[in-house]
């Protein structure tokens, strides 16, 4: 069964719908790659997904240990390479 439906909206923007909940993520190409930069870029979501995944695993362990992990934060920095354009560091 599919998890999401991604639709290209034009102008280097996509809409991703989570099929189980209906929640939506909009992505937009960054200004330095011909986009408007008005939303997370696809590579931003990759970097943020890594932090979210780490926090989810840490939250599971915190629950097991009866430790309050709520309100923990992370700042995510993504470094892009060129030729080809790619994530080189998170």
Predicted regions and their residues:
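Extended beta-strand/beta-hairpin segments
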Residues: 1-48, 56-90
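Short cysteine clusters
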Residues: 53
């Amino acid at each position: 069964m599919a998890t999401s439906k991604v639709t290209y909206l034009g102008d280097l923007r996509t809409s991703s719908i989570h099929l189980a909940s209906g929640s939506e993520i909009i992505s937009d190409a960054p200004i330095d790659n011909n986009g408007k930069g008005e939303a997370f870029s696809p590579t931003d979501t990759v970097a943020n997904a890594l932090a979210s995944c780490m926090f989810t695993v840490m939250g599971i362990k915190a629950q097991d240990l009866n430790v309050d992990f709520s309100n923990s934060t992370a700042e995510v920095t993504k470094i892009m390479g060129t030729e080809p354009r790619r994530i080189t560091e998170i």
